[in-house]
Curated annotation (Swiss-Prot):
Subunit structure: F-type ATPases have 2 components, CF(1) - the catalytic core - and CF(0) - the membrane proton channel. CF(1) has five subunits: alpha(3), beta(3), gamma(1), delta(1), epsilon(1). CF(0) has three main subunits: a, b and c.
Localization: Cell membrane
GO molecular function: ATP binding; proton-transporting ATP synthase activity, rotational mechanism
Name of the protein described by the UniProt record: ATP synthase gamma chain
Similarity comment: family membership: Belongs to the ATPase gamma chain family.
PANTHER family (alphabetical): ATP SYNTHASE GAMMA CHAIN (PTHR11693), ATP SYNTHASE SUBUNIT GAMMA, MITOCHONDRIAL (PTHR11693:SF22)
Primary subcellular site in the record, as a coarse category: membrane
Function: Produces ATP from ADP in the presence of a proton gradient across the membrane. The gamma chain is believed to be important in regulating ATPase activity and the flow of protons through the CF(0) complex.
Entry keyword annotation includes Membrane: yes
Length: 305
């Protein structure tokens, strides 16, 4: 019985140590989520305005740009998967990988070969273990991405897209060959309690038209010209799309981690309470047995006299 009591006390200490870790992770995530949300909210107006400007350019001028034109018989599709660098964030990464596999299946059914790009160590490890050839990977900033990180990623993706598919071979390769489409898989932040894994095509670009109030049509003049202005804005637009996805994912990761660590802390509390109750019962049983043995011994001595 004493051995069982020692075992219970050891389990209580272990649960207490785990609780300290999960509580610390919960507090860290809680402290960072507000800043992540603020960065996300501050980036959204810029993304909206640059999208509106490109919409105006596309509507008012006849533009023929590689990032606007659908390619005949596309064979290779670049896919950027945005994951986390660290774990302890619930089903955050599992949902991303599940959504990515769904996209890969759709691409293969359409006769397109996925070409993989990843952000985050979790995606790097996940796809390396499954023998995927990862064309390019970026790590170390999943919780706090910068615009420079997004610009580097967008530059790599745009270069691959502009290079295009030359040989038409249908194989996974990290040889630097071009792609005919660009997709991004990330987690959209909706609220502290709701995040969803999303997949969007970013090239060839689908211009998102914004509804305007009914009234006289506004006429625009472009200086120096619409094509040059479009070519100047387009890299910023694509970088902004990637940056927004990184910020959405960062906020979602922190929210998932905060929620997962709170759940783990609550479970540790429940486990400690249950183990403490069991330990108290074992201790009471041990004391009762000891008292019974003492009383029995005293009675035996009294009878012997």
């Amino acid at each position: 019985m004493a051995a069982t009591l020692r075992e219970l006390r050891g389990r209580i200490r272990s649960a207490g140590s785990i609780k300290k870790i999960t509580k610390a992770q919960e507090l860290i995530a809680t402290s960072r989520i507000a800043r992540a949300q603020a960065r996300l909210e501050s980036a959204r107006p810029y993304a909206f305005e640059i999208t509106r400007m490109l919409t105006t350019l596309a509507a008012e001028a006849a533009l023929d740009h590689p990032l606007l034109v659908e390619r005949p018989e596309p064979k290779r599709a670049g896919v950027l998967v945005v994951s986390s660098d660290r774990g302890l964030c619930g089903a955050y990464n599992a949902n991303i990988f599940r959504r990515s596999e769904e996209l890969f299946s759709l691409l293969r059914e359409a006769g397109k070969q996925p070409v993989l790009y990843v952000v985050g160590r979790k995606a790097q490890n996940y796809y390396s273990f499954r023998n995927w050839n990862i064309t390019e990977s970026w790590m170390g900033f999943s919780e706090q991405p910068t615009y420079e990180n997004a610009a580097e990623i967008a530059s790599t993706l745009v270069d691959a897209f502009l290079l295009g598919t030359d040989n038409g071979e249908d194989q996974r390769s990290d040889s630097g060959e071009g792609v005919d489409e660009l997709h991004i898989v990330y987690t959209e932040f909706k609220s502290m309690l709701s995040q969803s894994a999303e997949a969007h095509r970013i090239a060839p670009m689908v211009v998102e038209y914004v509804e305007e109030d009914i009234g006289p049509r506004t006429l625009y003049s472009f200086e120096p010209d619409a094509t040059m202005l479009f070519e100047s804005l387009l890299p910023r637009y694509l970088t902004t799309r990637v940056y927004a996805a990184l910020l959405e994912s960062a906020a979602s990761e922190l929210a998932s981690r905060q929620r997962a660590m709170k759940s783990a802390t609550d479970n540790a509390d429940d486990l400690i309470k249950a183990l403490t109750l069991m330990a108290n019962r074992e201790r009471q049983a041990q004391i009762t047995q000891e008292i019974s043995e003492i009383v029995g011994g005293a009675n035996a001595l009294a009878e012997a006299r």
